Amino acid sequence: MRSSKYLLSTLKETPSDAEIVSHQLMLRAGMIRKVAAGLYTWTPTGLRVLRKVENVVREEMEAINALEILMPMVQPADLWQESGRWDDYGPELLRIKDRNQRDFLLGPTHEEIISQLVRKEVSSYKQLPLTLFQIQTKFRDEIRPRFGVMRAREFLMKDAYSFHLTDESLQKTYDDMYKAYCRIFERLGLDYRPVIADTGSIGGSHSHEFHVLASSGEDAIAFSDSSDYAANVEMAEALAPAGERPAPNQKVEKHEVQGDELAAVLQPLSVESQQATKSFIVKAADDIDSEYVQLVLRADHELNTVKAEKLAQVAAPLEILTETEKATGVEAPYIGVVNAKLPLLVDSSAAHLADFACGANENGQWLTGVNWKRDTGDFSVVDIRNVVAGDPSPCGQGKVKIARGIEVGHIFQLGKKYSDAMKVGVLSESGKHETLTMGCYGIGVSRIVAAAIEQNNDERGICWPEALAPFQVVIVPMNMHKSARVQEAAEKLYTDLKAQGIDVLFDDRKERPGVMFTDMELIGIPHQVVVGERNLDENQVEYQSRKGGEKQKINLDDCISFIQQQL
């Protein structure tokens, strides 16, 4: 490709509304242009990268015998009404009407459409197992689209769905898909972690997320420093402290305190936050003989709402009471565990405390020297906190480390949630009608592009992994339009590289060398070859890798083989 025939629209300045590095660099490198909030046009440079992601994803899906299809982005409401999600889905679902006033929607996901297809086309166990995938545009009407294509309203996604008669068959496909995802991210040159995850609104049982590690990531990942264990923080088990709870040494004392913040309350008591408790009042499950229950944690720990919502005693969705006087008679900072009016669900770390401080269940009062059982009623020990760095790893090996991650893939074992609702089944070998069990496997194709930039950039621009770069090589001729010799050498090099199947950009613009170098470094082409008069005097060209290293003089006759070795 010649720059003179190419849409190369770089920016010198960073747009003011671009918050994270990938958004800034995608705009400056001319990869995307904003159309409206969360909506972007992909330019030729951006689309070249996007297509490279697509190609790797497609190859790995086909390698595990997944069959590609294409489903409509616009979906009829009646299918979503059949599954129950028309009413359950929130405002992220963009609902529209056609000219006949029939309800439709822009698809955020395609479980209903794929279920309808399989329901109509698959009737026998002999057609199973079956895995279908597509690479298709999705739309979710985010309340606050931000970070460019990282959290856009319209995005490109690969979604695959598998159908099985048995859980064992589903598990095999799930394992194959897990390995395929690992190969995809390895081929794309990304530093990633597969993590145990919550199934969320999609539903189902087993689930893994795939995260690209980056400081700008929205998700916290807990992983072991001594094993392959990794989990989303919301799913990582917080192990109970080892050993017996210490014996009581103090008597209970009451103190008058002031302030609404925990730190202000604890300071005059000379109590550290890890030696105090805090409480949350939440709505109880219907079968509990109380309208509310009290969740108790160590004061230095964070409540894990996903874990809390899964407790049998807690109503789902989790409802944390803000006006606590209604349930306890006191304001939130003064809720404690002595003479508690509600059932107590105590995190295991808090349950290991002795001689601790807590609210006195009287406004303006706190207690010190409190001990479980001696001073409290019955309680249940649960795991309801987020793990923190330094905790024992849930796998039993090493300590927990915490990193930020960008979710770029998610796989689920859906079970029969959708196939039951949509009546998707086949005749088994015995002639009996059997409901199918499903798997669901998503990759954020457009999000991968942004995540890769978050992981691969410097002060000059993007430093693409080889597999993702819009071009593999750029030829930068010095003053080509004034030197026939430079033009001839650059043209021949361009022709020879193309003949070898190398993806090359020939920067033949009438621009100053400084502008050309700045643009190419910003775009992030991995290999740069400079053709100039001085080096041609010695039958040489100059080579430099975008990721650094010394400039090298390469014999012009050896240039093609040298570039091939670098690739």
Curated annotation (Swiss-Prot):
GO terms for biological process: prolyl-tRNA aminoacylation. One of its GO terms (molecular function) is aminoacyl-tRNA deacylase activity. It catalyses: tRNA(Pro) + L-proline + ATP = L-prolyl-tRNA(Pro) + AMP + diphosphate. PROSITE patterns: AA_TRNA_LIGASE_II (PS50862). InterPro entries: aa-tRNA-synt_IIb, aa-tRNA-synth_II, aa-tRNA-synth_II/BPL/LPL, Anticodon-bd, Anticodon-bd_dom_sf, Pro-tRNA-ligase_IIa, Pro-tRNA-synth_IIa_bac-type, Pro-tRNA-Synthase_IIa_type1. Disulfide bonds: none annotated. It is an enzyme of class 6 (ligase). Its EC number is 6.1.1.15. GO terms for cellular component: cytosol. It is found in: Cytoplasm. It comes from the Bacteria. CDD domains: ProRS-INS, ProRS_anticodon_short, ProRS_core_prok. Pfam families: HGTP_anticodon, tRNA-synt_2b, tRNA_edit. Keywords: Aminoacyl-tRNA synthetase, ATP-binding, Cytoplasm, Ligase, Nucleotide-binding, Protein biosynthesis. Its main location: cytoplasm. Homodimer. HAMAP family: Pro_tRNA_synth_type1. NCBIfam families: PRK09194.1, proS_fam_II. Consists of three domains: the N-terminal catalytic domain, the editing domain and the C-terminal anticodon-binding domain. Belongs to the class-II aminoacyl-tRNA synthetase family. ProS type 1 subfamily. Catalyzes the attachment of proline to tRNA(Pro) in a two-step reaction: proline is first activated by ATP to form Pro-AMP and then transferred to the acceptor end of tRNA(Pro). As ProRS can inadvertently accommodate and process non-cognate amino acids such as alanine and cysteine, to avoid such errors it has two additional distinct editing activities against alanine. One activity is designated as 'pretransfer' editing and involves the tRNA(Pro)-independent hydrolysis of activated Ala-AMP. This is Proline--tRNA ligase.
